[in-house]
Regions:
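Tandem repeat scaffolds
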Residues: 2-351
Length: 351
C-alpha cells in the first residue's frame, strides 16, 4: 500500500487557486481549512483526521473513502458532495449543509449532526453508530434505505418524504420528529421513541414497532399493513383512516386512541387496551378482539362482521349503528352498552 502524500495547507491552496483539483490520497491530518472555498476538489481517500474545516465550502467535493474522524466541519457547505464510504468517528457536522450529498456506505460513529441539512441526501447502507446526534436534522426527501441508525438521537428531525425502506431505527429517539409521507417498508423501529411524532400518510408496511413508544403520535392515513406493533404504546395516538389490515396489535395499549375510519380488518387485537378509544366507522372485519378492553369505547357505525369479541369488555361502549353480523360475543361484558340500531350477530336490528 502506497504511503499517503503529505502536503501543506498553503501549498494545496496555491495549487487549487492555479486550477488543480485532484488531491486524492493526500494526508492533511489536523490541517486548518476554516472558511476556505474548495468547491469541486477531489480529496478521495484523503486523511483529514482532526482537520478544522469550519465554514469551509466544499460544494461538489469528492471525499469518498476519506478519513474524517475527529474533524470539525461545523457549518461547512457540502452540497452535492461525495462522502461515499467515508469514515467519521466523533466528527462534528453541526449545522453543516449536506443537501444532495452522498453518504452511502459511510460509517459515522458518535457523530454530531445536530441541525444538519441532509435534504435529498443519499444514505443508502450508511451506518450511524453509538448514538449519533441528529437532533433537529433536516432529511427531507433523503434516501436511507438499509441504513443503520439504531440508538440515534433524532429528536425534532424532519424526515418528510424520505425513503426509509429496511432501515434500522431500533432504540432511536424520534420524539417530535416529522415523518410525513415517508416510505418505511420493512423497517426496524423496535424500542424506538416516537412520542408525538408525525407519521401521517406514510407507508409503513411490514415494519417492526415492537415495544415502541408511539404515545400521541400522528398516524392519520398511514398504511401499517402487516406491521408488528406487539408491546407498543399507542396511548392517545391518532390513527384516523389508518390501514392496519392484518397488523399485530396483540396486548397493545391504545387507550383513548383515535381510530375513526381505520381499517383493522383481520388485525390481531387480543387483549388490547382500547379503553375510551374512538373506533367510529372503523372496519374490524374478522378482527380478533378476544379479551380486549373496550370500556367506554366508541364503536358507532363500526363494521364488526365476523369479529371475535369473546371475553371482551364492552362495558359502557357505544355500538350504535354498528354491524355485528357473524360476530362472536360469548362471555363478553355488555353492561351499559348502547346498541341503538345495531345489527346483531343473527342479522336482526336491535331496537
Amino acid at each position: 500500500m502506497s504511503k499517503p502524500k503529505t502536503v501543506t495547507v498553503n501549498k494545496l491552496l496555491t495549487r487549487y487557486a492555479q486550477g488543480e483539483r485532484n488531491f486524492s490520497d493526500i494526508s492533511l491530518v489536523a490541517a486548518i481549512f476554516n472558511e476556505v472555498t474548495l468547491n469541486r476538489i477531489n480529496l478521495s481517500g484523503a486523511n483529514l483526521s482532526e482537520a478544522l474545516m469550519v465554514h469551509t465550502r466544499l460544494i461538489g467535493a469528492n471525499l469518498s473513502r476519506s478519513q474524517l474522524s475527529y474533524a470539525d466541519l461545523s457549518m461547512a457547505v457540502l452540497i452535492d458532495a461525495n462522502l461515499t464510504g467515508a469514515t467519521m468517528t466523533e466528527t462534528v457536522l453541526h449545522q453543516a449543509d449536506l443537501s444532495g450529498a452522498s453518504l452511502s456506505g459511510a460509517i459515522l460513529s458518535q457523530v454530531n449532526l445536530t441541525g444538519v441539512n441532509l435534504t435529498g441526501a443519499g444514505l443508502i447502507g450508511t451506518c450511524l453508530l453509538n448514538g449519533s446526534q441528529l437532533t433537529d436534522a433536516i432529511l427531507v426527501g433523503a434516501t436511507l434505505t438499509r441504513s443503520v441508525l439504531s440508538g440515534a438521537h433524532m429528536t425534532g428531525a424532519n424526515l418528510n418524504r424520505s425513503i426509509l425502506s429496511e432501515i434500522d431505527l431500533s432504540g432511536a429517539n424520534l420524539t417530535g420528529a416529522t415523518l410525513i409521507r415517508v416510505h418505511l417498508n420493512q423497517g426496524n423501529l423496535s424500542g424506538a421513541n416516537l412520542t408525538g411524532a408525525d407519521l401521517s400518510e406514510s407507508v409503513i408496511q411490514n415494519s417492526n414497532f415492537c415495544i415502541a413508544n408511539l404515545t400521541g403520535a400522528n398516524l392519520t392515513g398511514a398504511n401499517l399493513t402487516g406491521a408488528n406493533l406487539n408491546g407498543a404504546n399507542l396511548t392517545g395516538a391518532n390513527l384516523t383512516g389508518a390501514n392496519l389490515t392484518g397488523a399485530n396489535l396483540n396486548g397493545l395499549t391504545l387507550q383513548s386512541a383515535d381510530l375513526r375510519l381505520a381499517n383493522l380488518s383481520k388485525a390481531d387485537l387480543r387483549g388490547a387496551n382500547l379503553t375510551g378509544a374512538n373506533l367510529a366507522g372503523a372496519n374490524l372485519l374478522e378482527a380478533d378482539l378476544r379479551l380486549a378492553n373496550l370500556t367506554d369505547a366508541n364503536l358507532c357505525g363500526a363494521g364488526l362482521l365476523l369479529t371475535s369479541l369473546r371475553g371482551a369488555n364492552l362495558a359502557g361502549a357505544n355500538l350504535n349503528q354498528a354491524n355485528l353480523i357473524g360476530a362472536s360475543l360469548s362471555v363478553a361484558n355488555l353492561d351499559h352498552t348502547t346498541m341503538e340500531g345495531t345489527i346483531l350477530p343473527n342479522g336482526a336490528t336491535h331496537q
